[in-house]
Structure formats: structure tokens, C-alpha cells
UniProtKB/Swiss-Prot annotation:
PANTHER family linked: IG-LIKE DOMAIN-CONTAINING PROTEIN (PTHR19944:SF98), MHC CLASS II-RELATED (PTHR19944)
Any one biological process term the GO annotation gives: immunoglobulin mediated immune response
Protein name as annotated: Ig lambda-1 chain C region
Keywords of the record: Disulfide bond, Immunoglobulin domain
Alphabetical list of InterPro entries matching this protein: Ig-like_dom, Ig-like_dom_sf, Ig-like_fold, Ig/MHC_CS, Ig_C1-set, MHC/Immunoglobulin
Length: 104
């Protein structure tokens, strides 16, 4: 089966969630093969290790998908202006970013 580079989609926290003093960023990684990849979250370019949860890739239509979550407090979300989800798969790296200014 040919290799497939993942598609990466990054979702910001919802305004409803921010009202509860939480902020969850969701990085969806879809349509990749083989089913091994790593996710690195960054805040303003600095890797974040705390509050990261990544699901095990599962097979869907002969390819794999996984989701990674970055769990923050609303205050932490407001501390940085740019967040990114960097996915490394085989020799390819796909990075998606969002700036907080665009989400408010």
C-alpha cells in the first residue's frame, strides 16, 4: 500500500469552553499510512509537553486517523498568541497553526 501523508486540521477552543476557564485545542490527523506518526504542540514556537493527549491511530478505509488534544486553562491560552500542531509522518512534517487573534 502506498504511503499517504496526513491531512492536519487544527480547531481552536470554543467560546463556551473559555467561559469555564478551560481551553482545548484539537488537532485532527487524517488519511495517513502507515499508521505511525508523532504530534508536537507548540506555543509561539516553543514545544509544549504538558496537557497533551494523543489517541492511538485507528484504521479507517485502509488509512489511519488520530486526534491530539492540547488541554489548557483559559489563562494559558491567552498567554500566547500562536499555537501550532506539528505532525511528523515518515519523512514528512505537516504543521498547522492558529493565531489567537483570529479566534476571538
Amino acid at each position: 500500500q502506498p504511503k499517504a501523508t496526513p491531512s492536519v486540521t487544527l480547531f481552536p477552543p470554543s467560546s463556551e469552553e473559555l467561559k469555564t476557564d478551560k481551553a482545548t485545542l484539537v488537532c485532527m490527523v487524517t488519511d495517513f499510512y502507515p499508521g505511525v506518526m508523532t504530534v508536537v504542540w507548540k506555543a509561539d514556537g516553543t514545544p509544549i509537553t504538558q496537557g497533551v493527549e494523543t489517541t492511538q491511530p485507528f484504521k479507517q478505509n485502509n488509512k489511519y486517523m488520530a486526534t491530539s488534544y492540547l488541554l489548557l486553562t483559559a489563562k494559558a491560552w491567552e498567554t500566547h498568541s500562536n499555537y501550532s500542531c506539528q505532525v511528523t509522518h515518515e519523512e514528512n512534517t505537516v504543521e498547522k497553526s492558529l493565531s489567537r487573534a483570529e479566534c476571538s
